[in-house]
Each structure stands twice: as structure tokens, then as C-alpha cells.
Design a protein with these regions (language model features):
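N-terminal secretory signal peptides that target proteins for export/translocation
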Residues: 1-12
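N-terminal single-pass transmembrane signal-anchor helix
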Residues: 13-43
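N-terminal pilin/flagellin-like segments and related low-complexity appendage regions
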Residues: 42-281
Length: 281
């Protein structure tokens, strides 16, 4: 009788990853994920930038629509007005008791600067307090020319007073708001000036009647704003009609980080809109 023998079947071993190989794979995955996150973040920022630009344009259209309906530009809102303009009805002067309002409080003379009066002009959407926000959740800001040339005529308000606008006509030009390419060499005024270097002037003092501005992704009140963004911030009590507008720059740029988005209404656009509506001869 033959004895049976147990036959052993060899199973080939499956090759596994060594610790070094796993580490390499993890590094590659982390690199790819980091690149994807960076790309996603950049795409998100670009989308929000585009959305904000559209919001600024819509706000501009709403301001001009209000102007056609009322024969004047709206005054700025302030941080306590729930999105309504702050204006002395009898004189057309922007601000309570004749003082201009800005984001941080009152400004006497110069430019009437504050927040977009979204409720007054019928702009949507607004937040629960009545303020228009950019795509990053910052309140849209709004400045308007106060000083004119010639400077005669009473009451003093022109662009925010329908009766004066009609009486003075298109011969009256703004003489304070100015947009510059850099804060270097500027003079606050009023009237404001971009300085002696001609290429620093984006507009002159007789061009801009209103400015609508988003403080961008880094918002208002950042810990270390660049000099260009400081200029657009106009801290409490500043009597400063100069604004800066240029392409975004990083923190290491000469005048620091800048991501504000600035849009303005020219006096030519204002007058042509009113003429087309039959409100000016």
C-alpha cells in the first residue's frame, strides 16, 4: 500500500509597498492636492472678483436710474442710516446738519464719502441692515463730488440738488474727486491732485462726479494695508477726495497689497443721461 504524501502548493507572494514607496506616494498626493486647492482658490477669487465687478456696474446703473427719476445724484449713506442716503432736503447738502458723512463718521467739506445708499436707489440685494455687499461680504462704498467749478450759485449743493442742477446746467463741473494710479506724490486737496507725474493721473479733477468702490478680498481695516489702500480707506474725519485705482498687487509691491475695485461716473455720462431723459437742455 502506497503512503500518501501531502503536496505543498507554492503560492507566489504578492509584492507590497515599502515604507519608502508609501512615503513617496503620499508626497505626490499631497503635492497634487495642494496644487488643486491653490487652483480652486484662485478660481474662486477670480469668480468673486468678476461678481463684484458686476455688482459695481449694477450699482452704477442704479445710481444713474435714481438720477433720471429725481434729477440729481443720491447722497451717500452712513453706517447708521440703514442703507438710506443722508441728506438735508432743504439744501441738498449731503450729511446731517450740512456735514458730509463717510464710512467712519462725519467729514466737513471736500468730498461727501460713505456707503452706497442701496435702499434709496433701489439696489438689490442688500443685507439685513440695508447695505449692499460685494462678493466677499464687504459693504460697497460711495463718494460724490461736492466742490464745483465755477463755485458760485446757491445753495452750495449742485449734483445732489435737482433745482441747482437744472439752473446751473452743464457748465458746472466737479472739482474735487480724482482717481490716481498710485498714492505716491498725491495731494489731498481739495481739489485733489495726482501730483506732478502726468502718468499717475487716471482722471482729472473735472471728470468724476461719483465713485463706487469695493475694498476687495482683504476688506476694510486690515492690519497692515498698503499706502494705496490706505488712501482709499479715508479714515475718520479725513477730508480727502483722492482715490487710487490699478490692477491688483501683492503684499511685497512698492505700495503694498492692493485689491480694491473702483468704478466711477463721469460728468459727461451724468449730463448725457439727464439730457437724454429731457431733464437738462
Amino acid at each position: 500500500m502506497k503512503s500518501s504524501r501531502t503536496r505543498r502548493i507554492r503560492v507566489p507572494r504578492q509584492a507590497g509597498f515599502t515604507l519608502a514607496e508609501i512615503a513617496i506616494v503620499l508626497v505626490i498626493v499631497a503635492f497634487l492636492l495642494g496644487g488643486m486647492m491653490s487652483m480652486f482658490s484662485a478660481q474662486t477669487d477670480q469668480r468673486k472678483w468678476n461678481d463684484t465687478q458686476s455688482q459695481l456696474q449694477a450699482a452704477r446703473d442704479a445710481v444713474l436710474g435714481f438720477t433720471v427719476a429725481n434729477g440729481r445724484l443720491p447722497c451717500p449713506a452712513n453706517s447708521t442710516s440703514a442703507g438710506a442716503e443722508v441728506r438735508v432736503v432743504a439744501t441738498g447738502v449731503c450729511g446731517a446738519v450740512g456735514n458730509a458723512q463717510d464710512y467712519y463718521g462725519g467729514v466737513v467739506g471736500g468730498v461727501t464719502y460713505g456707503l452706497l445708499p442701496a435702499v434709496t436707489i433701489g439696489y438689490q440685494p442688500v443685507d439685513s441692515q440695508g447695505f449692499a455687499l460685494d462678493a466677499w461680504g464687504n459693504r460697497l462704498r460711495y463718494a460724490i463730488a461736492r466742490v464745483t467749478t465755477p463755485s458760485t450759485g446757491t445753495p452750495s449743493a449742485n449734483f445732489t440738488y435737482a433745482s441747482n442742477m437744472k439752473t446751473n446746467g452743464i457748465s458746472y463741473l466737479p472739482n474735487d474727486l480724482v482717481v490716481c494710479a498710485s498714492a505716491t506724490g498725491i495731494s489731498a486737496g481739495p481739489p485733489g491732485s495726482c501730483g506732478a507725474v502726468a502718468t499717475n493721473s487716471v482722471t482729472n479733477q473735472k471728470t468724476v462726479v461719483a465713485i463706487i468702490l469695493s475694498p476687495g478680498k482683504n476688506g476694510v481695516g486690515q492690519t497692515a494695508p498698503g499706502t494705496d489702500e490706505i488712501q482709499n480707506g479715508n479714515t475718520a474725519g479725513a477730508n480727502n477726495p483722492v482715490f487710487i485705482s490699478h490692477t491688483p498687487t501683492p503684499t511685497g509691491a512698492t505700495n503694498g497689497e492692493f485689491d480694491d475695485q473702483v468704478l466711477w461716473i463721469s460728468v459727461g455720462t451724468l449730463y448725457s443721461t439727464l439730457i437724454a431723459a429731457g431733464l437738462l437742455p
